[in-house]
Amino acid sequence: MEKQTVAVLGPGSWGTALSQVLNDNGHEVRIWGNLPEQINEINTHHTNKHYFKDVVLDENIIAYTDLAETLKDVDAILFVVPTKVTRLVAQQVAQTLDHKVIIMHASKGLEPDSHKRLSTILEEEIPEHLRSDIVVVSGPSHAXETIVRDLTLITAASKDLQTAQYVQELFSNHYFRLYTNTDVIGVETAGALKNIIAVGAGALHGLGFGDNAKAAIIARGLAEITRLGVALGANPLTYSGLSGVGDLIVTGTSIHSRNWRAGDALGRGESLADIEANMGMVIEGISTTRAAYELAQELGVYMPITQAIYQVIYHGTNIKDAIYDIMNNEFKAENEWS
């Protein structure tokens, strides 16, 4: 592939890690953010210490606060901003962009009030004459591992296979490999909903439960993620792939996962306010829990784990009581769909 110019919108942990992957592949990378001190740190010291204390970035990675300067003559734009501001940033891009580009996003969540997937938001806000079909970049990936060039395999999903293949080639190298998929709904819902299950898995750990319980919540969590995804039009096979069970395993079992750590703290009795303050990073599983719960209610999809976590987070239900309620649900066959 010829050298591409890519704007990475969002200098968080994942945006920074993906910027390094693109830079390693010989592309021109421009990171955009709205915190001048962070942008100055990246440009002056080539670090982003809020997320990576011991990592030095390549000096060719340049950061900007000016969106117009960031987007000038770019070939592709990668959104890696928090779910709640995706629409706002997309509107700003639409007002600034003056040529057609490849649009990608690597965030995982649902818009809190509309319950919409992020690709839908980007389609709504960025006119077709300025963009390709949206490409979702998602899968089992800790930024802390990717930034040190540990092996990572994820998915590029788009309704247009050729566009997904462009992104596959854009990112792939000896330590970072992408597979293509045309099931955008499946890949996006898997990436968003696994954060909820990770909160629950972390809570079980915080409460002192063992591996049996953790395996159960991952398996049963995958079942309800699949039910909701299929109700939205996803291919059920997607959930057995990298962006499905793969992402659920890495997020639902690891201390590197901020959603798992948030659940662990909840299980140990910390308040949500204290957890969010101490974390210093967005916990997408919290807002996604409400969106998924409300969407499941709207569609009539059975999601007992999501419902339990929703009750704990938003109504103050005792976690042990929520677990008791799940364990005392009516008996069902394992493969029962409702």
UniProtKB/Swiss-Prot annotation:
NADPH binds at S13, W14, K108, A143, R258, V282, E284. Its EC number is 1.1.1.94. It catalyses: sn-glycerol 3-phosphate + NAD(+) = dihydroxyacetone phosphate + NADH + H(+); sn-glycerol 3-phosphate + NADP(+) = dihydroxyacetone phosphate + NADPH + H(+). One of its GO terms (cellular component) is cytosol. It is found in: Cytoplasm. Belongs to the NAD-dependent glycerol-3-phosphate dehydrogenase family. Catalyzes the reduction of the glycolytic intermediate dihydroxyacetone phosphate (DHAP) to sn-glycerol 3-phosphate (G3P), the key precursor for phospholipid synthesis. This is Glycerol-3-phosphate dehydrogenase [NAD(P)+].
